[in-house]
């Protein structure tokens, strides 16, 4: 049965200054573009609404394969780039308690970004609890409810829990951020995302509490009265025969070694010692399929001194798992440049943008350390013009 949100009548989020975004959608801010002479990668020093409109007008519609953005969270804080004893202002999040102004800002940007993404592309929007749910409704409208893939929960990292100093609390400590993942097309498929996670082989009970009568059959003289066996009868009988062959002819070597010698695709079932239930063998694993709870890595890093620097492991996972070599990756709130550095390392093309001089300077330095030289001062062709943004 189709979701109600997939019908012609859409659910929309309305706010106090609804439609204000239309008044700012065409604003032309000063822009500066830094371009690599060989790869064509672009770094914009400008307001990102100007940059995405420039890309639309210069042939990038439907060309970007993966977008990761980390917009302000609506905390109302000032952020810095801290090096030794020097603090350089990076940006100020002015949206605390100003939900309508935040929505006026983010809506037109997401609307244009949606046009830039390729048919098989995706967007990942990194937020926290302050404005996550408002942005989710907006993205359902712009990208389509049916194109929502996951909310990814990511561990913040080394953030101290300050609640220990109080005798009572009014809320729990927040230890996670969230990333909203949308695809451009509902039919797009991805390979299983795998992460390293070494697990030894083990025997486990073959019975499951899922109640399917058609999966109840006799094994070792026993038929379950409720629940079911995990596999079909034919598959289970073959696994029993496999184990009999191993015990009869190869018991002098460990079962795991025998499994490796037989192309690592044999399955085994045996009668559990001392009880009537069968058990099946789970082979060792070096990788497991990733789910949406990412507690094995951290969202933030502290290598550059930039307050909101994202961890390279986070971007390696997103870019490595959900894009291909030579794909075009973009980050329109690029901050310290982690997305661009990782994209460069993984063999992707990239586009970055930030309005902060501090962020652009830091990004340039990081890219230079990634064997990437930038040609500065190029101005865009067409009607956009202007000098450097301070």
Predicted regions, residues:
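Conserved SAM-binding loop of SAM-dependent methyltransferases across substrates and taxa
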Residues: 338-348
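PRPP-dependent phosphoribosyltransferase catalytic core
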Residues: 357-390
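Class I SAM-dependent methyltransferase "Motif I" SAM/SAH-binding loop
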Residues: 333-337
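Conserved SAM-binding motif I beta-strand of class I
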Residues: 350-354
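Class I S-adenosyl-L-methionine
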Residues: 7-328, 360, 367-370
């Amino acid at each position: 049965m189709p979701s109600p949100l997939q019908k012609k009548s859409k659910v929309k989020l309305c706010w106090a200054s609804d439609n204000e975004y239309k008044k700012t959608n065409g604003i032309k801010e000063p822009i500066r573009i830094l371009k690599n002479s060989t790869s064509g990668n672009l770094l914009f020093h400008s307001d990102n609404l100007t940059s995405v409109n420039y890309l639309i007008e210069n042939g990038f519609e439907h060309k970007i394969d993966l977008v990761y953005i980390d917009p302000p969270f609506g905390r109302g804080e000032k952020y810095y780039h801290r090096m030794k004893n020097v603090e350089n202002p990076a940006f100020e999040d002015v949206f605390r308690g100003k939900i309508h102004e935040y929505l006026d800002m983010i809506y037109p940007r997401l609307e244009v970004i949606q046009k830039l993404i390729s048919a098989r592309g995706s967007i990942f929007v990194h937020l926290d609890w302050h404005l996550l749910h408002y942005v989710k409704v907006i993205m359902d409208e712009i990208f389509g409810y049916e194109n929502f893939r996951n909310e990814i929960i990511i561990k913040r990292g080394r953030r101290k829990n300050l609640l220990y100093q109080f005798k009572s609390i009014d809320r729990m400590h927040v230890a996670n951020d969230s990333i909203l993942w949308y695809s451009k097309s509902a039919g797009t498929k991805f390979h299983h995302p795998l992460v390293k996670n070494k697990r030894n082989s083990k025997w486990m009970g073959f019975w499951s509490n899922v109640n399917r009568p058609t999966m109840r059959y006799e094994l070792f003289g026993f038929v379950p009265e409720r629940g079911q066996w995990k596999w079909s009868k034919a598959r289970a009988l073959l696994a029993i025969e496999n184990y009999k062959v191993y015990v009869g002819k190869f018991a002098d070597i460990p079962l795991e070694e025998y499994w490796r010698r037989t192309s690592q695709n044999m399955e085994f079932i045996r009668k559990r010692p001392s009880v009537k239930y069968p058990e099946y063998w789970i082979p060792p694993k070096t990788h497991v399929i990733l789910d949406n709870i990412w507690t094995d890595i951290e969202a933030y890093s502290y290598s550059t001194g930039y307050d909101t620097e994202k961890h390279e492991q986070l971007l390696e996972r997103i870019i490595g798992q959900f894009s291909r070599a030579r794909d075009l990756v973009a980050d329109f709130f690029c901050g310290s440049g982690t997305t661009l550095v990782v994209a460069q390392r993984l063999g992707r093309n990239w586009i970055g943008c930030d309005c902060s001089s501090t962020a652009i300077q830091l990004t340039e330095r990081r890219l230079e350390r990634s064997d990437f030289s930038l040609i500065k001062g190029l101005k865009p062709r067409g009607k956009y013009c202007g000098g450097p943004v301070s």
